[in-house]
Amino acid sequence: MSKITFLGGGSFGSALAVLLAEKNNVVNIYDRDKNVVNEINIKKTNEKYMKDFAIPKGVTAFNSIEEAIDGADYIVLSVPSHVIRSMCIAIKGKIPRDIPIISIAKGIEEDTDKRLSVVIEEELDNPVVVLSGPSHAEEVVMRIPTTIVSTSKEMKFAADVQDLFMTPYFRVYTNDDIIGVEVGGAVKNVIALAAGVIDGLGYGDNTKAALLTRGMKEISRVGIALGGRAETFYGLTGMGDLIVTCTSMHSRNRRAGLLIGKGMSLEDALKEVGMVVEGVKACRAFYQLKERIGISMPITDGLYKGLFEGKNAKSIVDELMNRDKKSELF
């Protein structure tokens, strides 16, 4: 039995907290929202992030970070990507250095273009494990068979986290390509936003297939440029996560894109979704990154112009379709 603290009471963190509690672990959740904390502790629900599902008795919520992390064997950073650094700063010097930090966010730091594990390493001296893959919280909590990947620079810790989370319905693989795993999980959010836009525009299966396939090319292109391995992008954290995020009704990124494709402004679409849409910040970050390192990411480029420069979505699709001819494998 282990004690695991989740810093953030969002949907995926809550789903994993339920999973670990059902394995007879002691689970703490820190959340800054007192209403969320009280609801978890009193009603044993978290309706804001996980509707219609009960929280096991083994889960306790706290408003105090210090209380939540006290005695923890593992700490899970279950906050959005833009909060990762500030959360690490909040626990710096308050935990032993041998406690693994598990990152479940999918994105990069917008202002620095740094992967989230790098951000964590800059602030903390603890081992870092990244847990990523095609895993919507709504399905995990329903015990629908799910597969995911655990990765770290120190594979002993990746294997420990594999054992920690493995259940008959939640299968965890290990992969030593932490760069590829993180980049795949971040860029697929950009492609998922674009997938939602083309759905909102009313395009069909042919268009969606083209977007996913060429989106996969963008993921692998930037991932390899940053040091990831090609085969990683055709695994769970690349192709697998891309498929589920671009096609699922659960995907916040696809839903936001769908609303934008139907004519809603970015601001209004984000309000309608009501939760963090990582693809928006990732789009800006990867647009800046591809400009800096000099690689071609036409889907990301087009989405950026639509989101931040007000360009018409249909005209962006027309431009993509009328680019200079070239080999598919370029």
Swiss-Prot record:
It comes from Clostridium beijerinckii (strain ATCC 51743 / NCIMB 8052). GO terms for biological process: carbohydrate metabolic process; glycerol-3-phosphate biosynthetic process; glycerol-3-phosphate catabolic process; glycerophospholipid metabolic process; phospholipid biosynthetic process. GO terms for cellular component: cytosol. NADPH binds at residues 11-12, 32, 106, 137, 252, 276, 278. InterPro entries: 6-PGluconate_DH-like_C_sf (IPR008927), 6PGD_dom2 (IPR013328), G3P_DH_NAD-dep (IPR006168), G3P_DH_NAD-dep_C (IPR006109), G3P_DH_NAD-dep_N (IPR011128), NAD(P)-bd_dom_sf (IPR036291). Its EC number is 1.1.1.94. It is an enzyme of class 1 (oxidoreductase). Pathway: Membrane lipid metabolism; glycerophospholipid metabolism. Gene3D superfamilies: N-(1-d-carboxylethyl)-l-norvaline Dehydrogenase, domain 2 (1.10.1040.10), NAD(P)-binding Rossmann-like Domain (3.40.50.720). This is Glycerol-3-phosphate dehydrogenase [NAD(P)+]. Sn-glycerol 3-phosphate binds at residues 106, 133, 135, 188, 241, 251-253. Catalyzes the reduction of the glycolytic intermediate dihydroxyacetone phosphate (DHAP) to sn-glycerol 3-phosphate (G3P), the key precursor for phospholipid synthesis. Pfam families: NAD_Gly3P_dh_C, NAD_Gly3P_dh_N. Keywords: Cytoplasm, Lipid biosynthesis, Lipid metabolism, NAD, NADP, Nucleotide-binding, Oxidoreductase, Phospholipid biosynthesis, Phospholipid metabolism. The active site is at residue 188. It comes from the Bacteria. It catalyses: sn-glycerol 3-phosphate + NAD(+) = dihydroxyacetone phosphate + NADH + H(+); sn-glycerol 3-phosphate + NADP(+) = dihydroxyacetone phosphate + NADPH + H(+). The lineage of its organism: Bacteria, Bacillati, Bacillota, Clostridia, Eubacteriales. GO terms for molecular function: glycerol-3-phosphate dehydrogenase [NAD(P)+] activity; NAD binding. Belongs to the NAD-dependent glycerol-3-phosphate dehydrogenase family. It is found in: Cytoplasm. HAMAP family: NAD_Glyc3P_dehydrog.
